[in-house]
């Protein structure tokens, strides 16, 4: 990014915190505390030491000095202990980061085992039926064999993603044991991984185009309307997309010539976006079977095993000189520089907050005076009903009131923008969201410190 789009040090490629409800203590705060501890240790090192005795009562002078030294040093000891504790905290944080990185890598590698166990269970249950009932469905077991082949193919793609990502974020050492024993992954991690496979449909397949048109296109249209080429040098319009997922919205914005940065903190998303953005260039050269996990609501057996192809465009086809990047980390920790961004575009994002007011506060701070915030999405709060997790579930009315009290001016507001999210178009069950679209502007004269 240009100097105008500088972000804090934590925005550089570094291991982001675990996704959603499983976050570690903020690394930024611990690093700041560690710096304070080091400064205090340096203060101790600058304490005066006794000069060579030149006469009088050397032993008395030395004892007097030692007594005074004890008095001077004693108040420093709690600080030294605190500094040592902070060092231990940072070491623990790094250990947790390595463990989280390896846990997600393991989930990618465990996918095939997990899915084969699922299919094997279905086969056992089918074979427990009376023989006359089994004979009514001669294609059932061959269909399961087809699913097994799809699983193996998906695992090959996931292994390719893993092979590339073990060296991401300067964490090469984290991947050195990547060929080690695969251990069972949690149900939570496997659900996240299966959901990530559907993100390829949403962001990088032809099948996902209607969904992108419903929620990405309104954002892009507002960007073009507010930053027209007649009045703006696109390359100097700095746009941030928090919660960028696999990066398609940010990529589309950069494709128009704007300087765009996507931000994401889920390793499932970051590993996958790294693969599609940096390793895929030929259109529709890759294939996935994202619907094989869905054993219910299939009209036809073939619907379950149909493939999707990606990417539907060449991610490397950005115009020469384009300014497009992705950062890894927590949105609130990374972006702290006041008055930096011309536009912030959030899509299905604000309900990922523990406290959506924190998101609003960060957006207000980092937007330039006169900058705009464009939002599309529902309010399906991700931490609702999770034990031991802060979750403030506000209505849109409440959110709107908070936005106005911060000082934003509402320029566009639509309360029923119909959209889906990673929908299976052939499924017998679909979820539709009536999303809110709004465009709000930070006044020129306002600057929040």
Curated annotation (Swiss-Prot):
Transmembrane segments: none annotated. Residues 1-91 are annotated as: Disordered. Its EC number is 2.1.1.22. One of its GO terms (biological process) is methylation. Optimum pH is 7.0-7.5. It comes from the Eukaryota. N-methyltransferase that catalyzes the formation of anserine (beta-alanyl-N(Pi)-methyl-L-histidine) from carnosine. Anserine, a methylated derivative of carnosine (beta-alanyl-L-histidine), is an abundant constituent of vertebrate skeletal muscles. Also methylates other L-histidine-containing di- and tripeptides such as Gly-Gly-His, Gly-His and homocarnosine (GABA-His). Two different proteins belonging to two different protein families are able to mediate carnosine N-methyltransferase activity in chicken. This protein, which is conserved from human to yeast, and another protein (AC U3NEE3), which is not conserved in mammals. Belongs to the carnosine N-methyltransferase family. Homodimer. Each monomer accommodates one molecule of carnosine in its active pocket, precisely anchoring the histidine imidazole ring such that only N1 is exposed and deprotonated for methylation. This is Carnosine N-methyltransferase. It comes from Gallus gallus (Chicken). The gene is CARNMT1.
């Amino acid at each position: 990014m240009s100097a105008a789009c500088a972000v804090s040090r934590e925005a550089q490629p570094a291991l982001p915190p675990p996704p959603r409800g499983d976050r570690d203590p903020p690394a930024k705060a611990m690093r700041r505390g560690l710096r304070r501890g080091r400064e205090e240790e340096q203060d101790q090192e600058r304490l005066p030491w006794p000069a060579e005795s030149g006469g009088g009562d050397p032993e008395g002078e030395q004892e007097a000095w030692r007594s005074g030294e004890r008095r001077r040093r004693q108040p420093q000891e709690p600080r030294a202990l605190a500094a040592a504790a902070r060092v231990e905290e940072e070491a623990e944080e790094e250990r947790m980061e390595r463990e989280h990185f390896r846990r997600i890598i393991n989930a990618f590698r465990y996918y095939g085992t997990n899915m084969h166990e699922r299919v094997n269970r279905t086969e056992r249950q089918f074979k427990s039926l009376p023989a006359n009932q089994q004979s009514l469905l001669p294609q059932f077991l061959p269909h399961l064999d087809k699913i097994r082949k799809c699983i193996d193919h998906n695992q090959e793609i996931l292994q390719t993603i893993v092979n590339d990502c073990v060296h991401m974020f300067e964490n090469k050492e984290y991947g050195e044991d990547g060929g080690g024993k695969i251990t069972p992954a949690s149900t939570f991690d496997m659900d996240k991984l299966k959901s990530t496979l559907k993100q390829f449909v949403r962001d990088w397949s032809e099948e996902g185009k209607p969904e992108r048109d419903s929620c990405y296109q309104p954002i892009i249209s507002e960007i073009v309307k507010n930053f027209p080429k007649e009045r703006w040098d696109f390359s100097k319009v700095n746009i941030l997309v928090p919660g960028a997922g696999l990066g398609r919205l940010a990529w589309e914005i950069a494709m128009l010539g704007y300087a765009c940065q996507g931000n994401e903190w889920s390793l499932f998303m970051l590993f996958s976006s790294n693969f599609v953005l940096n390793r895929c260039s030929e259109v529709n050269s890759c294939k996935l079977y994202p619907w094989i996990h869905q054993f219910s609501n299939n009209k036809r057996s073939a619907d379950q095993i149909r493939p999707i192809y990606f990417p539907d465009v060449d991610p490397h086809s950005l115009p020469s000189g384009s300014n497009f990047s992705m950062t890894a980390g927590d949105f609130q920790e990374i972006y702290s520089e006041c008055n930096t961004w011309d536009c912030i575009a959030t899509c299905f994002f604000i309900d990922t907050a523990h406290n959506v007011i924190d998101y609003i506060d960060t957006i207000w701070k980092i937007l330039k005076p006169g900058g705009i915030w464009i939002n599309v999405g529902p309010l399906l709060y991700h931490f609702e009903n999770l034990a031991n997790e802060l979750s403030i579930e506000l209505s849109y009315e409440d959110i709107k009131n908070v936005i106005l009290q911060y000082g934003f001016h509402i320029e566009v507001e639509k309360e029923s923008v119909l959209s889906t999210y990673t929908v299976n178009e052939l499924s017998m069950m679909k979820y539709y969201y009536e999303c809110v679209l709004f465009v709000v502007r930070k006044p020129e004269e306002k600057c929040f410190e």
